[in-house]
Amino acid sequence: MKVKVIPVLEDNYMYLVIEERTREAVAVDVAVPKRLLEIVGRERVSLTTVLTTHHHWDHARGNAELARLLPGLVVLGADERICALTRRLAHGEELRFGAIHVRCLLTPGHTLGHMSYFLWEEECPDPPAVFSGTGCPVPTCPTSPCPIPLSLTHPTPQGMHCPWPAAAHAWRAQFSRCTRAWWRPWAPCPLRQ
C-alpha cells in the first residue's frame, strides 16, 4: 500500500492510496480534482473510488467534477450531504480494494456524519493508515507511526469547542502520554482484529 499525501488549498490534504499489485487507487477527501488527476496520471493507476470523511467543501467539493470526468467512479461516505455520493457507509463496515482492507469508523464531532477510515494490508510490513479528515484535533495525529485510540482523536462535540490554549496543552499532554504507553511495534493492532 502506497499513500501519496497531496497538499491542497492553504492548509488541507487529499490522499491517493495505491494498491501496488493491481494499480487500483482510492482517493480520500477530494478537494481539487485536477491536481488529483495529474498525480493519478503520473502514478499510472486506475482511480475507482473516493472515500469522503465529511461533507464540508474543503473535503468534498471535487467529488462532482471527478465523477463527471470518470464515469463509474464510486463516491463513498457516511453523510448524505456529501457531493456526488454513490453509497452511504455504515459504522464498522469493511471494504476491500485488492489487498487493501478498509474499516469505516463513524467519528462524529466535527460534523454529525464524520467518518474516519482505517486502512491496512495483510502480511505487509508497512504500518496501517488512518484518515480522520477534520476529526483529529492533535496536530501530530495524522502522521503518527501507529494507530491512535479514537477516544483521543475524536472527542465529543462539546469537547471540540473547549477554550484554547489551556485545552490544547491538556490534549497534547494526554496524547503524548497515551501514545508512549499504548504503542508497541510488536503488539497486534487492536483495530485490525
UniProtKB/Swiss-Prot annotation:
On whether Cell division is a keyword of this UniProt record, the answer is no
In this chain, Zn(2+) 2 is annotated as bound at: D58, H59
> What keywords appear on the UniProt entry?
Hydrolase, Metal-binding, Zinc
| E.C. number(s) listed in UniProt | 3.1.2.-
Q: Which gene encodes it?
A: HAGHL
Indicate the enzyme's highest-level EC class.
Answer: hydrolase
Task: Report the cofactors.
Answer: Zn(2+)
Q: Does the keyword Zinc apply?
A: yes
Q: Which family does it belong to?
A: Belongs to the metallo-beta-lactamase superfamily. Glyoxalase II family.
Positions bound to Zn(2+) 1: H54, H56, H110
Q: Cofactor comment in the record?
A: Binds 2 Zn(2+) ions per subunit.
Q: What does this protein do?
A: Hydrolase acting on ester bonds.
Picking any one GO molecular function of the record gives: metal ion binding
What's the protein called, per UniProt? Answer: Hydroxyacylglutathione hydrolase-like protein
SMART domains reported in the protein's UniProt record: Lactamase_B
